[in-house]
Amino acid sequence: MEENMEEGQTQKGCFECCIKCLGGIPYASLIATILLYAGVALFCGCGHEALSGTVNILQTYFELARTAGDTLDVFTMIDIFKYVIYGIAAAFFVYGILLMVEGFFTTGAIKDLYGDFKITTCGRCVSAWFIMLTYLFMLAWLGVTAFTSLPVYMYFNVWTICRNTTLVEGANLCLDLRQFGIVTIGEEKKICTASENFLRMCESTELNMTFHLFIVALAGAGAAVIAMVHYLMVLSANWAYVKDACRMQKYEDIKSKEEQELHDIHSTRSKERLNAYT
């Protein structure tokens, strides 16, 4: 009988421990982190492959070659964008971990408001710093989303020209890279519907794949923006809770101090009355 009672108490203790651990998880920050990682993964992975597909399309169908020397051409710009993608992936992987850690500490501070946990001034400054940094990153991701929409628009135009060529017989349409700013005005790199390269490009799966990769990358950038907005809401709410917790702690400290003073006064008066009586 005693063994069963001890076993039941042990199971109850484990269950309470699990409930306490689950209660300390910052679920809002966890959802935002998952959304951020998913968005960054889609943007970086699909964006990198879409840029590689763009290089192959330019070299294969437009017969565009790399410029010798240190001249800044479209291929050099694409390489720079790839390195930027590597940096974005690494930076936001670390930033997501930092925000999760901040969420755990803030949740612990709120849960242990009436315990021994003390919210320091440094912790409040870190929360405010994360709010400011997340807001700047949200603006940056808005810019990235707007910039990613440009290749989507370009590939949509190319896809439309290919579709119109197949639907309208005898249509004479040309695609000039100068109108997209890919080459300089002095260079003439265009293909028309009558050329073999244009027909091969429209029939290839590479064009369709690159177009859809850019669309997915755009969706990933949009998901990152939503994650940043979610983080801002979470951080702002945590900041408000922590601020109220600090005020509550000050109130409790003042109240305890006043009660102690009243107790000391009553004790002193009781001693004086006792001495006077004796």
Curated annotation (Swiss-Prot):
From the UniProt annotation, give the residues forming the signal peptide. none
Sites where N-acetylmethionine occurs are at M1
InterPro entries in the record: Myelin_PLP, Myelin_PLP_CS
What Pfam families does the database record attribute to this sequence? Answer: Myelin_PLP (PF01275)
Gene Ontology molecular-function annotations? calcium channel activity
Listed under GO cellular component are: axonal growth cone; dendritic spine; filopodium; glutamatergic synapse; neuron projection; neuronal cell body; parallel fiber to Purkinje cell synapse; plasma membrane
In this UniProt entry, which residues form the Cytoplasmic topological domain(s)? 1-22, 106-127, 235-278
Q: Which residues are glycosylated?
A: N164, N208
Q: Which cysteines are joined by disulfide bonds?
A: C174-C192
- Tell me the protein's name: Neuronal membrane glycoprotein M6-a
First-listed, main subcellular location of the protein, grouped into a coarse class: membrane
Q: List the expressing tissues.
A: Widely expressed in the CNS. Found especially in the granule cell layer of the cerebellum but not in the molecular layer or white matter. Expressed in the immature embryonic retina including the nerve fiber layer (NFL), inner plexiform layer (IPL), and outer plexiform layer (OPL). Weakly expressed in processes of Mueller glia cells.
Which PROSITE patterns does the UniProt entry name for this protein? MYELIN_PLP_1 (PS00575), MYELIN_PLP_2 (PS01004)
* Description of how the protein assembles with itself and partners: Interacts with OPRM1. Interacts with palmitoyltransferase ZDHHC17/HIP14; the interaction leads to palmitoylation of GPM6A.
Indicate how the chain sits in the lipid bilayer.
Answer: Multi-pass membrane protein
The record's account of how the chain is modified after translation: N-glycosylated. Palmitoylated by ZDHHC17/HIP14.
Indicate whether Repeat appears among the record's keywords.
no
Q: Where in the cell is it found?
A: Cell membrane; Cell projection, Axon; Cell projection, Growth cone; Cell projection, Dendritic spine
Phosphothreonine occurs at which residues?
A: T278
Q: Which UniProt keywords apply?
A: Acetylation, Cell membrane, Cell projection, Disulfide bond, Glycoprotein, Lipoprotein, Membrane, Neurogenesis, Palmitate, Phosphoprotein, Synapse, Transmembrane, Transmembrane helix
Briefly, what is this protein's role? Involved in neuronal differentiation, including differentiation and migration of neuronal stem cells. Plays a role in neuronal plasticity and is involved in neurite and filopodia outgrowth, filopodia motility and probably synapse formation. Gpm6a-induced filopodia formation involves mitogen-activated protein kinase (MAPK) and Src signaling pathways.
The biological process GO terms on file are: neural retina development; neuron migration; neuron projection morphogenesis; positive regulation of filopodium assembly; regulation of synapse organization; response to bacterium; stem cell differentiation; synapse assembly
